[in-house]
Every structure is written in C-alpha cells, then in structure tokens.
Curated annotation (Swiss-Prot):
Residues 310-359, 675-724 form the LRRCT domain. It comes from Homo sapiens. Residues 377-386 have a biased composition (Pro residues). GO terms for molecular function: collagen binding; collagen fibril binding; extracellular matrix structural constituent conferring compression resistance. This is Chondroadherin-like protein. Residues 364-390, 728-762 are annotated as: Disordered. Keywords: Disulfide bond, Extracellular matrix, Glycoprotein, Leucine-rich repeat, Repeat, Secreted, Signal. SUPFAM superfamilies: L domain-like (SSF52058). Its main location: secreted.
Length: 762
C-alpha cells in the first residue's frame, strides 16, 4: 500500500518545486524599475516624464498597464519597442520629438486602449506602423506635421472610437483614408489645411457621429463627400472660407442634429441648402457676411439659429425670415445692422410688421441710400440657372487643371513664365506654385472675383506690381512664401481688402512692409519667418487692428522699439524665436492685453530682469524661453504672471539656480530639463516649490558631485543641512524675497528700475 501512495505524490511535488524556484524571479521582475522612472506597482503605473530619454527603457515591470513617457527625446519608435510590457492599456508619448514610427512599433500591445502621440514631429505614418493595436479605442495624433494619409494606415484599428488628427498639415484626404475604422464615432480633422476631399474620403465609417473640420481651407461645401457619413449627428465646418451654401452642394445627412458654419465667409444661403437634413436642430452661422437669410425649407426640427456677428439688414426683405422664425418656433440671436432705426435690435425681439415695406418712392429711396452708406455688399452667389450667366465656366488655361465641382484650378509646376488667364470665373482656389514669375503684373487675375485662396509659392517672384491683386475682393489667403521679395507696396495689395492670411516666409525682407499692411484692414495672421528683418519699429504693423497672429521667427531682430506692436491691440500670438534679442522687449509688450502666446526661444537673452513680462501678465498662457542661453533669472522676473500661465519652457539653458514660482499655480507644463542646476541651499526654495507640484519638470542636479544626476524635486538629502530645513512645513517664503545670495552676471542687474528706464529698447 505504501508504494502506490508515494508514487502518486511525485507529480504534485515537482510543480510545487518549480513554482517555488520561479517565485523570486517573478517578484524581482515585478519590483524592477528604471532609474529615470517612478513605478507604482500597486496601480501598475510607470512614469518616466521629461527625463531626456533617447530610447524606451528596457527594465519596465512586465505587468505595467499605464506607461507615461511624455517629454523625452525618443525621436524614433523602433519595431517591437514595447514587447516587454504586453499588458499596457495606456501609453503616453506626447512631446517626445518623435519623427518616425517604424512598422510594427506597437506589435504585442493587443490590450492597449489609448495611444497618445500628440505634439511630436511626425510627417507620415508607415503602412503598418499601427499594426497589433486591435483593442485601441483612442488615438491622439494632434500637433504633428502629417502632410498626407495613406489608405490602409488605420486598417488594423477595428475597435477605435476616437481619432484625433487636428493641428497637422493635411491638405488632401484621399479615397478610403479611414478604411477599417468601423467603430469610430469622433473624427477630428480641425486646424489643418484641407482644401480637397476625395469623393470616397469618408467611405466606410458607419459609426461616425461627430466630424470636426473647422479651421481648414474648404472653399465649397463638400456635400456628397460628407453625405457618405450617414450617421453624423454633429458636423463642425466653422472657420472655412465658404462663401455660399445651397441645395446643389448636395448635403444629405438624415441624422444630423448640429451644424456649425461659424466664422466663415458666407454671403448667401440657398433656401433649400439643408433640405436633406430633416433632423437638424441647431444651425450656427455666427461671424459670417450674411445680410439676409431666406426661410429655410426642409429642416422641420430646427429650433436654434445662431446669427450673431452677421451684418443683418432688417428691411422689408427680412420679413419672410421673421415670419418663418415665428411660425417654426426657431430661436435666433442675431442683431440688426440697419436700417438706422433698428440698428442693434435683437432679431428675436422684432415682429414682422416692425420691418417696413415702404409704400412711397421717397421712403424707398431713403432706405436704398442708407444701405449704400452702410457699405457695398457683393451680390449673393446662387446656383447656375442657365448658360451665359455669371457662373458659366470659362475654358481652362492650357497645361492647367480646373475642377468645377470643387471650384479649384491648379497649374502647379507647369514651367509657366507668366500668370495664365482664362480660369473659370467661379474659381475659389488657384494654385500657381513652383512656376517662374519674376513679377506679378497689374490686374494679373481678371475675372476672378470669387477667388478666396491664391498660391504663389516657389515662383521666383521679386516684385508685385501696383494693382496686381485688383478685383480680388474676396481673397482671404495669399501665399507668397519662398520667393525673392524684398519689399511690398500698399498699391500692390490694393484690391484685396478682405485678405486675412499673408504668407511671406523665406523671402528677402529687411524690414516689415508696414506701408503695405495698411492696405489690409482685415489682416488676421502675418507670416514673415526666416527673412532678414533686423528690427521692429513704430508703424511696421500699420493699422492692423484685426491682427491676431504675428510670426517673425528666424530673422535677425535685435530691437523691438517702444510702440512697434501698439496698433495690434488684439494680438494673441507673437513669435520672435530664433532672433538676436538680448533682452525681453518688456516696453514693447505694453498695450497687448490679449496676448496668449509669446515665443522668445533661441535668442541670446542670458538673463531675465524683474518684471520682464509684467505688461502681459494677465493674459499670457504660454511662454517659451528655451535655448536662450539663460544664466540668471531675477526673483521677480515672472511677477505679474499668475494663474493664467499654463506652460513655461525653460529647457536647454545654462541655469544653475532658479527662484521658486508659487504664483504660477495653474501650470500644466513646466520644462526645466538640460540645465546645470547647482544643488546647494540656494536652491532650497525651488526644491520645496517643486515638491508641491504634481508635474514632472526634468530639473536635475549637475553639481556638486555628490548630487549629480539627482532630480531637484527628489533630492531631499542634499538640502537636509540647509538653514530652515526643519521649518519646511511652515509657510513658504514668497518668490520675490531674496533667500540666498546670488552672483549677478557682469553687466546684468535685477531690478524693475533699470527695466523701466530701458523698457522700450532692446
């Protein structure tokens, strides 16, 4: 009896021995953690943020589910880069300077739900870069430099629900671009340069409910393309240069509830423009050029019509609109621009009989005169009604391609020596880039009164003659980048009063063409990067009161004079990076109450004085000071900057010390990496402040030797012998109080008094 009993126990004992032998190895694998990371094994989270890592760490615990690598220097994601962490569900690779994702980079991550590749430098995605992500629900590619999408790129993402491609450089959507995305509900394509959508671009998206296409260059409503997404409930098309929408545009979306067409260039709307959108509930037309609107036929469930910011004329012709609004119970929020007796009146507060239909010729003449004083308005563009009328299509110039459906014409790279003529009269986008026109003559674009976007890049243009843009009253985008222009006259730009975006990068400008800008009252965005401008003087920005964005990166600017930016009181973005500024132009920032983003990186600043950003303290949200040779930051340098500041970039400087910045309480990002911090008692206030931040900032000790490589935030042992260490839980010392001696840089002093004396100079 004993023999059989012992033999049955042998198979049970061996597996137990194997498990006992493997247990230490498993425990070690679970407890390992890369030196540059923080591992929370209880929650299976690993964070390696802002550590200047150039490759994915290979000692990450195998059972990790959330891996945060944001803010490193990975540049390339190689094949099978994450094969050692197959349990990942969330992977964050934002701000990693990624330029290439190799084929098969994410193979083995079959459980991944979120992949964040936003804010990198990707120009393309290889065909199989996203293979192996069969469970992925959300893919973030916002803020890259993607120029094209290849069909099949997303074919392996059958579970994806949200795809974010906003803020890239897409100009064209090919057919079947999103093939395989059977469960995508939200597709974000906003803030690109999309002007053409292939007929089958949105095919194969049966679950799509929300499509974001705002802030692109669509100049005609691509109805047939959009209508492929039959399940759309919300469509965002705002801030596109659309001038007209009608039934002939072919928009048919039976489930559409919200349609946003705000901030465009709409001058007319056909009564049946949305006749095939029967469930439309909200229509947003704010900020267009509509002076009148017909009763809309078809969308019987419409309840909200947003019309703010349109020059509505509440004369007799608006009575049908008011009657329809009352009958259909549609709420509207527009206001009358005229006639004078109704100016400013809310449309919703008027009754049809408030709009007079004059019975005598004198009264009618008075109204016509008043409307003329209010300003000429282009006649509304409607559908063609027969041959020989305004929209009759002219022959296309030889060697060019004219597409009637999109109203686009292109002669790109045709070797032309002069601007051709004979384009269709309803052309809205004209692409003449990569030809050779030494000059653009007077009236070079006759009969193109509907033109919205004109591309003249890489044409060797050295001169725009007076009147070159004559007749282009609807032009909004003018691309003159990569030419030989050294100057621009006001006479050259006359005829394009609605021009909003002017691109002059990589020309030969020695100064900002201020006189020319005076001819552009609607200028919104000025691009003058990579020229040879050496200073900004008063008058350089003309009378550009509508100006919001100014890009002057990569010039030779050494001085920004007091008042140089004054006319642009609504300025939101100012890019002065990669210039020769030796000081922050504090005085020149006076009078910019709306400034949100200031780029000063790549200037030889060396030091920041007290109150350097005081004039824009209340509005500024993003401040870039990286790669500026900074060696000293005075205690009050950031005074005035408060809770509004969201990001502060100080990486790649020469900072050995930095005051604490407790007033910056709402920071979402602060980058202090690649600075040689000296971790002695002088740095104690910074250490204390950083320990209270739930952010990875990248600050590491360079000296003394016993602290080298330690994170300033975590190097408690370095500061234990400092005076006041025992009182670390007491109320913190304000940043402006000098808590330690500082060695000032020769010729540089902290103090607002000196700033005040020289604040207008650089």
């Amino acid at each position: 009896m004993e023999g059989p009993r012992s033999s049955t126990h042998v198979p049970l004992v061996l597996p137990l021995l194997v498990l006992l032998l493997l247990a230490p190895a498993r425990q070690a694998a679970a407890q390992r953690c890369p030196q540059a990371c923080i591992c929370d094994n209880s929650r299976r989270h690993v964070a390696c943020r802002y550590q200047n890592l150039t490759e994915v760490p290979d000692a990450i615990p195998e059972l990790t589910q959330r891996l945060d690598l944001q803010g490193n220097l990975l540049k390339v994601i190689p094949a099978a880069a994450f094969q050692g962490v197959p349990h990942l569900t969330h992977l964050d690779l934002r701000h990693c300077e990624v330029e290439l994702v190799a084929e098969g980079a994410f193979r083995g991550l079959g459980r991944l739900l979120l992949l964040n590749l936003a804010s990198n430098h990707l120009r393309e995605l290889p065909q199989e870069a996203l293979d192996g992500l069969g469970s992925l629900r959300r893919l973030e590619l916002e803020g890259n430099a993607l120029e094209e999408l290849r069909p099949g790129t997303f074919g392996a993402l059958g579970a994806l629900a949200t795809l974010n491609l906003a803020h890239n450089a897409l100009v064209y959507l090919p057919a079947m671009a999103f093939q395989g995305l059977l469960r995508v509900r939200w597709l974000r394509l906003s803030h690109n340069a999309l002007s053409v959508l292939a007929p089958e671009a949105l095919a194969g998206l049966p679950a799509l409910r929300r499509l974001s296409l705002h802030h692109n260059e669509l100049q005609a409503l691509p109805g047939p393309v959009l209508s492929q997404a039959r399940g759309l409930a919300r469509l965002e098309l705002g801030h596109n240069p659309l001038t007209y929408a009608g039934e002939e545009d072919g928009l048919a979306l039976p489930g559409l509830r919200e349609l946003l067409l705000d901030g465009g260039a709409l001058q007319a709307l056909g009564p049946r423009a949305f006749a095939h959108c029967p469930r439309l509930h909200t229509l947003d037309l704010r900020g267009n050029q509509l002076d009148t609107l017909p009763p809309l036929q078809g969308p019987g469930q419409l309840r909200r019509l947003r019309l703010q910011g349109n020059p509505l004329w509440c004369g007799c012709q608006a009575r049908p609109l008011l009657e329809w609004l009352a009958r259909a119970r549609v709420r509207s929020d527009g206001a009358c621009q005229g006639p004078r007796r109704l100016r400013g009146e809310a449309l919703d507060a008027l009754r049809p009989w408030d709009l007079r239909c004059p019975g005598d010729a004198a009264q009618e003449e008075e109204e016509l005169e008043e409307r003329a004083v209010a300003g000429p308005r282009a006649p509304p563009r409607g559908p063609p009604r027969g041959p020989g009328e305004e929209r009759a299509v002219a022959p296309c110039p030889r060697a060019c391609v004219c597409v009637p459906e999109s109203r686009h014409s292109s002669c790109e790279g045709c070797g032309l020596q002069a601007v051709p003529r004979g384009f269709p009269s309803d052309t809205q986008l004209l692409d003449l880039r990569r030809n050779h026109f030494p000059s653009v003559p007077r009236a070079a674009f006759p009969g193109l009164g509907h033109l919205v976007s004109l591309h003249l890049q890489h044409c060797g243009i050295a001169e725009l003659e007076a009147g070159a843009l004559a007749g282009l009253g609807r032009l909004i985008y003018l691309y003159l980048s990569d030419n030989q222009l050294a100057g621009l006259s006001a006479a050259a730009l006359e005829g394009a009063p609605r021009l909003g975006y002017l691109y002059l990068e990589r020309n030969r400008f020695l100064q900002v063409p201020g006189a020319a800008l005076r001819a552009l009252p609607s200028l919104f965005s000025l691009h003058l990067q990579d020229n040879a401008v050496d200073r900004l003087a008063p008058g350089d920005l003309g009378r550009t009161r509508a100006l919001r964005w100014v890009y002057l990166s990569g010039n030779r600017i050494t001085e920004v004079s007091l008042g140089a930016l004054g006319p642009a009181r609504e300025l939101e973005k100012l890019h002065l990076d990669r210039n020769q500024l030796r000081e922050v132009p504090t005085g020149a920032l006076e009078g910019l109450p709306a400034l949100l983003e200031l780029q000063l990186s790549g200037n030889p600043l060396r030091a920041l004085r007290d109150g350097a950003f005081q004039p824009v303290g209340r509005s500024l949200q993003h401040l870039f000071l990286n790669s500026s040779g900074l060696e000293q930051i005075c205690p009050g340098a950031f005074s005035g900057l408060g809770p509004g500041l969201q990001s502060l970039h100080l990486q790649k400087n020469q900072l050995r010390a930095l005051p604490a910045l407790p007033s910056l309480s709402q920071l979402e990002l602060i980058d202090l990496s690649s600075n040689p911090f000296h971790c002695d008692c002088q740095l104690l206030p910074l250490h204390r402040w950083l320990t209270g931040l739930n952010l990875r900032v990248g600050a590491t000790c360079a000296t003394p030797p016993n602290a080298r490589g330690q994170r300033v935030k975590a190097a408690a042992a370095v500061f234990e012998d400092c005076p006041g260490w025992a009182a670390r839980k007491a109320k913190r010392t304000p940043a402006s109080r000098p808590s330690a001696r500082r060695t000032p840089i020769k010729g540089r002093q902290c103090g607002a008094d000196k700033v005040g004396k020289e604040k207008g100079r650089l």
